[in-house]
């Protein structure tokens, strides 16, 4: 007589499993096919990003920050310069603010496309991955035309503005992309949203209540998919988002399907913001020269008027004034924050990163208890984590 084993099994998922989206390890306790418990093990991609910041000037540190969330590197640059600008009281020219918003919203679209493709591949739909990468290539080409780099290390944001202005013909290419992309999002929806297999894999799976989401400190699409109307672009009024007409994507269900819907709507809204920003792009300087010219007096080169090659010159180091500040932006994954402490030195005394992925990942064990193993893949994919920012 063959006996059926009834004791629980401990299963290691990752850190090299393709569905883990990075070096995440999950210790999963199984009772047959049902998940009893789950313990995330993180830290495999820890690179000491906070300590590196405390030993670098802001200009030296900017090339590093793209490696936090390497799927959407511009947000890391934005929060890095915003933290210093707030502490030092540096203003940003209107044109520079518009350029920043254009880049950030294009980055949001690339992030959601990079989430959409692998998420559906995890669920068994391979073709949408190729579609998502096709559209994403357009944006990476736009990034390359401005910054010289495609995915990460754009190194575009500067304290007081941006590194370079847009090249000739870029705005037309950007508007062409927006006109091309909006119908493509509708195509994705027709292809995927009402697919019966897709619906059964996501509807009611990994649901979390509005109050639980707030208690866990969730942010971004994870929070808005629970019916909480909270978007830092509307709440904090940073950059020039108030100049544009757009809506916050909110869905009340709190499950994996709601998170998918939020991100799809966000891609549409980001596209609308980019269109409005490009059409209303103001003239003027693309950076606050005072932020670069912190050295006063005749030694300074910045007052000689040859601003044509300003981005080619090494930026003047300036001392971060005494004080502390917490600055946050609405990244593609949620609230990305920096707590900075300055002590009148060229390097910050303390640089604390508040990554959205790290906080959102903590809710995973609660979401997958009692679910099947196949559901775990869908739930983890719906959270949208990048291990670079989780481990820092």
Curated annotation (Swiss-Prot):
One Pfam family it belongs to: Complex1_49kDa
Membrane topology: Peripheral membrane protein
Cited InterPro entries: NADH_Q_OxRdtase_suD (IPR001135), NADH_UbQ_OxRdtase_49kDa_CS (IPR014029), NDH1_su_D/H (IPR022885), NiFe-Hase_large (IPR029014)
Chief localisation class: membrane
Enzyme type, top EC level: translocase
Disulfide bridge positions per record: none
CC annotations in GO: plasma membrane-derived thylakoid membrane
NAD in keyword set: yes
EC number: 7.1.1.-
Domain of life: Bacteria
Any one of the GO BP annotations: photosynthesis, light reaction
Record keywords: Membrane, NAD, NADP, Plastoquinone, Quinone, Thylakoid, Translocase, Transport
Localization per Swiss-Prot or TrEMBL: Cellular thylakoid membrane
GO molecular function: NAD binding; oxidoreductase activity, acting on NAD(P)H, quinone or similar compound as acceptor; quinone binding
Reactions it catalyzes: a plastoquinone + NADH + (n+1) H(+)(in) = a plastoquinol + NAD(+) + n H(+)(out); a plastoquinone + NADPH + (n+1) H(+)(in) = a plastoquinol + NADP(+) + n H(+)(out)
Quaternary structure, from the entry: NDH-1 can be composed of about 15 different subunits; different subcomplexes with different compositions have been identified which probably have different functions.
NCBIfam families: NuoD, PRK06075.1, PRK07415.1
UniProt record similarity statement: Belongs to the complex I 49 kDa subunit family.
Described purpose of this protein according to its UniProt entry: NDH-1 shuttles electrons from an unknown electron donor, via FMN and iron-sulfur (Fe-S) centers, to quinones in the respiratory and/or the photosynthetic chain. The immediate electron acceptor for the enzyme in this species is believed to be plastoquinone. Couples the redox reaction to proton translocation, and thus conserves the redox energy in a proton gradient. Cyanobacterial NDH-1 also plays a role in inorganic carbon-concentration.
Name the UniProt record assigns to this protein: NAD(P)H-quinone oxidoreductase subunit H
